[in-house]
Swiss-Prot record:
Keywords: Aminoacyl-tRNA synthetase, ATP-binding, Cytoplasm, Ligase, Metal-binding, Nucleotide-binding, Protein biosynthesis, RNA-binding, tRNA-binding, Zinc. Residues 224-525 are annotated as: Catalytic. This is Threonine--tRNA ligase. InterPro entries: aa-tRNA-synt_IIb, aa-tRNA-synth_II, aa-tRNA-synth_II/BPL/LPL, Anticodon-bd, Anticodon-bd_dom_sf, Thr-tRNA-ligase_IIa, Thr/Ala-tRNA-synth_IIc_edit, ThrRS_anticodon. It is found in: Cytoplasm. It is an enzyme of class 6 (ligase). Its EC number is 6.1.1.3. Binds 1 zinc ion per subunit. The lineage of its organism: Bacteria, Bacillati, Actinomycetota, Actinomycetes, Micrococcales. It comes from the Bacteria. Catalyzes the attachment of threonine to tRNA(Thr) in a two-step reaction: L-threonine is first activated by ATP to form Thr-AMP and then transferred to the acceptor end of tRNA(Thr). Also edits incorrectly charged L-seryl-tRNA(Thr).
Length: 640
């Protein structure tokens, strides 16, 4: 029996899960197994929809541009893309023509039919596709090809190879898709390879969902951290320094400093010990850690130094990660089970050679500072440490205003190459799954998404406009304890290998800065705002009164000042609204007499005749409690 028979009468089912494998409905169900349905509007269903849409995109391009050669075309978080080698770059007009052709293919109801073939057969069928041949030559003996079959004639209209699964036919795609933009990329991300055109699109289960997504995209343009960073004078990325290397200006520096100081305090409260490591090291360390083997393409080239002490000199590298250094700290002295868990933290700056096309503002940079930590634990304390790390993550992100999450669990692909025994992987995966489920958060599986050295869980956080960002990772490592010969002495006096956990709660301060800038649309909560209080005198006669009041804030380390400019008051207010100052105070004659001020908020609401002590207490409470204050109602809630 296949999936079509098993789910007959279920028009909403587009694929199935059996033995933790995603399968086409056309595949046979193993004897004694009961498959789970995958509906179109489920997370897996949307992934399959988008993957099928990528195939239709490629078919449309090749039907219009006969010279187009195929690269790869996966689904993405909200859509899909496909890479093409073409003689001329695609334009916006090209995308409209391609999209029209896609709709024609969708309405023709072509079936997606899977067939497993050997490498020789695949080589023959894709003999005119050089990029596909490169992939075929690097694959195992067999691979699956999906054929688009004409509904009337039964002839093959197009084909591509991939794991699948796919929708039963193109008709299931519907009309809720759109091509969004095109960019230039290098084949396999390597600048030594040919340049290709990457066409992006999005696809959804309904027209309403598509419109909602496109509306969010337009909103995202308004809150783009690159745009706001320039408007608010937060940071820049000067060409003189190089791609992906950021300068934080005074205001941006204040925000980042507040972010770092609070995160450091919370880490200390959670029992982490801060260490520091250099930015460069000899080649030997990264050979020992395996980074040169597994991560070398993402590292900056070496610097040959120390020829005065050695005729050949030594290769030094900018560090891409902090973990090898922390393992040296662990191994610097004998360790007992009494010292574990050992939590080593570092706000360490690392350098990664991202391709120029992948760099994106502060969200993807070449120089980044990670809120990095490595936990060395016994097997007995491993589960508790992972649970604590996850709880700490959720709590800390909540303090910065992110409070909606789901957890992704990345496990290994059974066919891949991995370090560690099957028993170790099964144990670690079980613990991560248990901790994730015990958290009460929604969980999603990411089969095959684990790194070669261990499974991981990642926290995906939802921002104010509905986008999810991968924020925090908690990653098990079977690799470094083995490579660095790490051990501790247990109760019986025997040497045991510690379990090592990598975790970064923000990913990097640069990326988290970008996320918060867009989440708050530049209107940071008062505790993070570079300028927290600005006081405006109606006339110069009111300056001494405001100076006296504003001076009180300095004892609380609150950033407050009096504006001495001679501009008209309405103009000043408009200027500070544009700068997104959380608290704008105004004082005139009546305020001097009554010892009050007027306080204006970002949305234009205000409170007049507010006693200065009450104003002071409210501002201090807003900052101390890390509350977002946009309106009078927000401020009133703090005063209650």
């Amino acid at each position: 029996m296949d999936g079509f028979e098993f789910f007959s009468g279920r028009s909403d089912v587009v694929a199935m899960i059996c033995d933790d494998r995603l399968l086409d409905l056309s595949e046979s169900i193993p004897s004694g197994k009961v498959p789970e349905p995958i509906e179109l509007d489920s997370p897996h269903g949307l992934d399959i929809l988008r993957h099928s849409c990528a195939h239709v995109l490629a078919q449309a391009v090749q039907s219009i541009y006969g010279d187009a050669k195929l690269g790869i075309g996966p689904f993405t978080e909200n859509g899909f893309y496909y890479d093409f080698s073409v003689n001329e770059p695609f334009s916006s007009d090209s995308l409209r023509v391609i999209e029209d052709k896609m709709r024609e293919i969708v309405h023709s109801d072509q079936k997606f039919v899977r067939k497993v073939v050997d490498r020789q057969s695949a080589h023959s069928q894709f003999r005119d596709e050089p990029f596909k041949l490169e992939i075929i030559n690097a694959t195992d003996d067999t691979l699956s090809i999906y054929y688009n079959i004409d509904a009337d004639s039964g002839s093959v209209r197009w084909m591509d190879f991939c794991r699948g699964p796919h929708l039963p036919s193109t008709r299931f795609i519907g009309d809720a898709f759109a091509l969004t933009h095109v960019s230039s990329v290098y084949w396999r991300g390597n600048s030594d390879n040919p340049q290709m055109q990457r066409v992006y699109g999005t696809a959804w289960g309904s027209a309403k969902d598509l419109k909602g997504y496109l509306d969010r995209v337009e909103l995202a343009k308004l809150v783009d951290h690159r745009k706001l960073g320039k408007e608010l004078d937060l940071f820049s990325l000067p060409d003189e320094i190089g791609p992906g290397l950021a300068l934080f200006h005074v205001k941006g520096g204040i925000i980042r400093s507040e972010m770092e100081q609070y995160a450091r305090l919370r880490h200390l409260e959670e029992g982490y010990n801060f260490v520091y490591s250099p930015h460069i090291t000899k080649r030997d360390l990264f050979e020992r850690s395996g980074h040169l083997q597994w991560y070398g393409q993402s590292m900056f080239p070496p610097m040959r130094l120390d020829k005065d002490s050695c005729s050949q000199g030594f290769d030094y590298y900018l560090k891409p990660m902090n973990c090898p250094f922390h393992s040296l700290v662990f191994s610097s002295q004998p360790r007992s089970y009494r010292q574990l868990p050992l939590r080593l933290a570092e706000f360490g700056t690392v350098y990664r050679y991202e391709q120029s096309g992948a760099i994106h503002g502060l969200a993807r940079v070449r120089g980044l500072t990670q809120d990095d930590a490595h936990i060395y634990a016994t097997r007995e304390s491993f589960e508790d440490e992972v649970s604590k790390a996850l709880q700490f993550t959720i709590s800390l992100l909540g303090d910065y205003g992110l409070d909606q999450f789901y957890i992704e669990i990345s496990t290994r692909d059974a066919s891949g190459k991995f370090l560690g025994s099957d028993e170790d992987w099964a144990y670690a995966t079980h613990i991560l799954q248990k901790v994730a489920q015990d958290s009460g958060l929604q969980t999603r599986d990411d089969p095959g998404g684990a790194a070669f050295y261990g499974p991981k869980i990642s926290v995906q956080a939802k921002d104010a406009i509905g986008r999810y960002w991968q924020m925090s990772t908690i990653q098990l490592d079977f690799n470094l304890p083995e490579r660095f010969g790490l051990f501790y002495t247990d109760r019986a006096g025997e040497r045991k290998r510690p379990i090592m956990v990598h975790r970064a709660l923000f990913g990097s301060f640069e990326r988290f800065f970008a996320v918060l800038t867009e989440h708050y649309a530049g209107a940071f909560p008062p505790w993070l705002s570079p300028e927290q209080v600005v006081a405006l005198p109606v006339t110069s006669a009111h300056i001494p009164y405001l100076e006296e009041f504003v001076s009180r804030f300095s004892s609380r380390l609150i950033r407050a000042r009096v504006d001495y400019m001679q501009d008209r008051l309405p103009k000043k207010i408009r200027s500070y609204v544009k700068e997104k100052i959380p608290f704008v105070l105004v004082a005139g004659d009546r305020d001097l007499t009554n010892r009050t001020v007027a306080i204006r908020f970002r949305d234009g609401t205000q409170i007049s005749d507010l006693p200065i002590q009450k104003c002071f207490d409210g501002i201090c409470a807003s900052i101390d409690r890390k509350k977002q204050i946009q309106t009078r109602i927000d401020f009133d809630s703090v005063l209650e």
